[in-house]
Amino acid sequence: MEKCYTDVTEFAIPNSTHKLYLSPVLDGFNSEIIAYNLSTSPNLEQVKSMLDQAFSEDHYTNTILHSDQGWQYQHQYYHHFLEDKGIQPSMSRKGNSPDNGMMESFFGILKSEMFYGYEKMFHSLEQLEQAIVDYIDYYNNKLIKVKLKGLISVQYRTKSFV
């Protein structure tokens, strides 16, 4: 059974009263970000959009989707959506972020490579949003991963299904 991971992380830049929230889904097979949503509010609409994008097709049936115990993942809509798609929800133990280590690791890599120390370079949330979009493209299509035998996430998936 395949396993995917999800969570929400927050970005704040100086000189802005607003924040940006990233809600991705990471495929545990090849560490690819298969879907994500960026929003100025971590609300249910953000999670709905991310779920629709990630699981529009049936090839994730019988997958486990792991998350923390955030309110979004306890919501009735979330559980009904997963049930309708044949996806099994899984949640971390309360206050135990290592349970969602793959997602937390992605957030750590993302923030250390393109955000921490660079916050002042972003003069608007739009600039930050574009930088995140560009980084996710880089992460999926250009970043070589040792755990994938020196391949890129998309290459590893493609090679595995040939």
Predicted regions and their residues:
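C-terminal domain-tail junction helix/linker
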Residues: E83-I87, K111-V162
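Hydrophobic (often cysteine-bearing) scaffold residues that line and stabilize catalytic clefts
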Residues: M1, L22, N43, V47, ...
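RNase H-like two-metal-ion nuclease catalytic core shared by retroviral integrases
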Residues: S67-Q69, H75-Q76, P89-K111, E126-E129, ...
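Active-site beta-loop-alpha junctions of metal-dependent nucleic acid enzymes
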Residues: H18, Y36-D58
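Short small-residue beta-strand/loop micro-motif enriched in glycine and branched aliphatics
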Residues: E32-Y36, S90-S92, Y116-Y118
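Catalytic cores and conserved motifs of cyclic dinucleotide signaling enzymes
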Residues: T17-H18, Q74-Q76
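Mobile-element integrase/transposase regions
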Residues: M1-P24, K48-S49, Y60-N62
